[in-house]
């Protein structure tokens, strides 16, 4: 083992919609986790890898946001986030720039007090506030928890992200190289493709629908002798009325989702894609243990 090589696992936590997936995507330098302006976009732990052969390797776990669960899927998401705190070497807690520490933040603080893992607080979106305010926010958070570091940053603008990486390496132990240098994620291509389709649906649909949708890949196969991949995917919703909205007038909404998804999938896979989408109704699937597992959210892992 290289005695100068550091390695370990880092989880990114925070309330829903605070910018966790955006931060991870920018740290890695490639889009892996889906992003949206709607809360609870991330449903699984997404494992991505940052490698600097001179310093070490960081394995990031982007977890679902910690929030009050409203159904079994919500309970699963919160359990994933909280369970991860016990598994990692460093915790990144992402917050928005504010003096207000609400019930959600207090809940996270209580969870952090149960572990001995070093916690780096990242105050995100500092590009949206005055500089003098940032000092106030840092002082506010210093009073509620003994953070290893507090870093003002902007995930979207990639501001201070080098400092975030430096501070992570500061607290990582010396250890082995877990993944090859070129590896950036342990997510299979089918899972990433499904998440891209779900992201485009999140962006296109009204607030009442997105949390009730899942996407699974029915078929994904390259054509022999051709630079093209055929992908058949199904968008699952909970209500017949939602199905109509997802399809849209004359199929316009489904076509829009498919077109936007296809463009990004082609960039990801570096090949032409023939994408076909279907919509099915599975009533109240978020309260069905069987369907939650069937759509790729595995409770047995936590």
Named regions from a protein language model:
Residues 42, 67-68, 100-101, 129-130, ...:
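Catalytic P-loop NTPase motifs of RecA-like helicase/translocase cores
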Residues 1-79, 83-86:
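Conserved G1/Walker A P-loop phosphate-binding module
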Residues 51-55, 79-150, 221-225:
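Conserved C-terminal guanine-recognition region of P-loop GTPase G domains, centered on the G4
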Residues 30, 49, 53, 69, ...:
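Conserved, well-folded catalytic cores of nucleic-acid-processing
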Residues 19, 160, 253:
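Conserved glycine(s) of the Walker
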Residues 62, 124, 154:
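Active-site glycine-centered loops adjacent to acidic/histidine catalytic or metal-binding residues
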Residues 117-118, 127-188:
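Canonical P-loop GTPase G-domain recognition
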Residues 189-302:
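P-loop NTP-binding site
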